[in-house]
Amino acid sequence: MKIAVLPGDGIGPEIISQAVKVLEALKSEGAKIEMETAPIGGAGYDAAGDPLPEATLKLAREADAVLLGAVGGPQYDTLDRPLRPERGLLRIRKELNLFANLRPALLYPELASASSLKPEVVSGLDLMIVRELTGDVYFGQPRGIETRNGERVGFNTMLYSESEVRRVAHVAFGIAMKRGKKLCSVEKANVLECSELWKEIMIEVAKDYPEVELSHMYVDNAAMQLIRAPKQFDTIVTGNIFGDILSDAASMLSGSIGMLPSASLDEHNKGMYEPIHGSAPDIAGKNLANPLATILSVAMMYRYTFADLATADRIENAVKQVIAKGYRTGDIWTEGTQKVSCSEMGDAVVVAL
């Protein structure tokens, strides 16, 4: 199993180091793992003048899976748009044809008090958001900023093809089948033709999955319902921009964005795995970051790309044990628990494993 390791920027190298510790522990037991590291984002720009250097893309293409830290930092904000770290991330997703983004939001019982919602609203939360990743307004053409009638105008194009919607629908229905057999499709079909097509195709694909109960919700209502009664959801499927916003909102239900992993898959289940949080430049290099989302991303890698459910469960259970023992990085620390550093948390997971 060949893994391309892309630490990226900010806290990326620190959290990736902890995930690599877990992989090394599995390797010491006999797992056939090969890891190679390459720069991406700001680190890619610093090394090669490109947020996605050719050598990094080649490594990612040849690997079975990609493990990514985080990209971005204020020192890159003045670069031309195509050279900014985030563009490297968008490009690698596009180049590897990673069209389905899976973002779980679950709450560990011990962290119920860390959520910004009342414990009774969120305890037992376990939902999955499936976000389409390569279409929509982020990639639609034409786009740009130009002068019209003497003033500047910014424009983007929201666009989905039937095949793009159909393939992410099949992924979402497949995941719903393995979970609670409930799928909620989120769009804005009352005002957007793009969403109208989305909804039509979801209804068509649903015929292939008679066991799954399909419902539909407008995105504004979905945002409200996620806060009002999040446990009504099991699996959500939505487009790129709506998924970007809703999954970040859902992340705070879990107590910390530092707890949540994600997977981005192609049609053969090759994937890129990363925590959903950003590069947190304010705490970079201070050994304060929470590595659990990155470690849980490794569990997702085993679940979806390597189809090794036993190892995925082992990693997830090791994280549960560490949380149950009261170890906490600063973002999830509460009175009466033990505050640990990023590297100490990584060590604790390896011991539990």
UniProtKB/Swiss-Prot annotation:
E.C. numbers: 1.1.1.85
Ligand binding (NAD(+)): 73-86, 278-290
Any one Pfam family match given in the protein's UniProt record, by short name: Iso_dh
Taxonomic placement: Bacteria, Pseudomonadati, Pseudomonadota, Betaproteobacteria, Nitrosomonadales
Cofactor: Mg(2+); Mn(2+)
Function: Catalyzes the oxidation of 3-carboxy-2-hydroxy-4-methylpentanoate (3-isopropylmalate) to 3-carboxy-4-methyl-2-oxopentanoate. The product decarboxylates to 4-methyl-2 oxopentanoate.
Subcellular localization(s) per the UniProt record: Cytoplasm
UniProt cross-references to HAMAP family, sorted A to Z: LeuB_type1
Sequence similarity: Belongs to the isocitrate and isopropylmalate dehydrogenases family. LeuB type 1 subfamily.
Lineage: superkingdom: Bacteria
Oligomer status and interactors: Homodimer.
Cellular component terms per the entry's GO annotation: cytosol
Cofactor: binding details: Binds 1 Mg(2+) or Mn(2+) ion per subunit.
Residues binding substrate, per UniProt: R93, R103, R131, D220
Annotated Mg(2+) binding sites: D220, D244, D248
Entry's Gene Ontology BP terms: L-leucine biosynthetic process
The protein's enzyme class: oxidoreductase
One MF annotation (Gene Ontology) recorded for this entry: NAD binding
Keywords, ordered alphabetically: Amino-acid biosynthesis, Branched-chain amino acid biosynthesis, Cytoplasm, Leucine biosynthesis, Magnesium, Manganese, Metal-binding, NAD, Oxidoreductase
Pathway where it operates: Amino-acid biosynthesis; L-leucine biosynthesis; L-leucine from 3-methyl-2-oxobutanoate: step 3/4
Name the UniProt record assigns to this protein: 3-isopropylmalate dehydrogenase
Keyword Cytoplasm (UniProt): yes
Catalyzed reactions per annotation: (2R,3S)-3-isopropylmalate + NAD(+) = 4-methyl-2-oxopentanoate + CO2 + NADH
Cysteine pairings via disulfide bonds: none
Site residues (Important for catalysis), renumbered to this chain: Y138, K188
